């Protein structure tokens, strides 16, 4: 099939590349001329494990192309996929301006049947708005389909190529057949396409992300109780996770969730609920707890240093909001760093992939350096992201480099007994403090 993907951000680039990998001819469209130029030359613009290899192969075999021209990009494409940003507005609602602008433009371009697929995370009723926007200037037949993505950053290629389910919202039998053919290469062992109406598909995406955010937040609340009661959240996590009704995933406590999806989608669903006169109290609590959790290490650090952080060198390991990505959007690390800077701390940080993005976000306010260079003469180390590189470091080297053997672990990377044996002062989430 010939496919056009509008938007070359995280979702758009993964979607375009993976559909090209299954034999389709894909044209990706973006208004950012510099990005299009880089992609056309084989310079990938995001970090995602396994993506670059597929990207370069399909670019080389001419199945993957890039352009800034919407009309030319969609000219011969039966399928037009919208993978556009829906950033939160000041009130938390999703900003649909990019999607509706493209829909309006498509209405002036389309002259024969097309299937418009919305992969962006959008409020309920967006498919109808896209339909209306296109129809205002278009006499040709077309269908608008809601097909939300469920890609985990760090596992996006795997999730796309081997999906646990594909949600498709459409009332058109014609579009349903085309979408079934599109996903057939990914469904060779089991047909996991779930068809429903557009509104249900749109809400499914919000419901999924909000539920996972709630699960994380619940465990963070349990972790707080563990600290007050003297219990161990890791043991409780195992006790909960072995219950098949609950499951093992998303039960790890920490310093809150970040990224481009969970914070934005929870806020958007709360706002959407208010639009139909419903107060979504659980999700309001999720937002409140998560904002506090992001900064939960800061008062601990201040307490350790008797509320005097001026001139203290704090090392930070981990900047991305999660491992295996360079995405720092809403990353807890940034919230912590900004607060520590306000207190007069000097920050030296390391991340395997996210340092370039962090430099653009924080400028020259912090030192970005190597993993062990960051801890030279540091007064304390903060672990903000659970990269595998941090799980088994050279502890002897750490001991010799650090001014004080003090660790504040926001991701529970290390075992308490190990820290005790090595003589570290160690604070983590929902577990007892190890004193040196």
Residue ranges and their predicted role:
Residues 1-436:
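Structural/interface elements that position substrates and couple domains in central-metabolism enzymes
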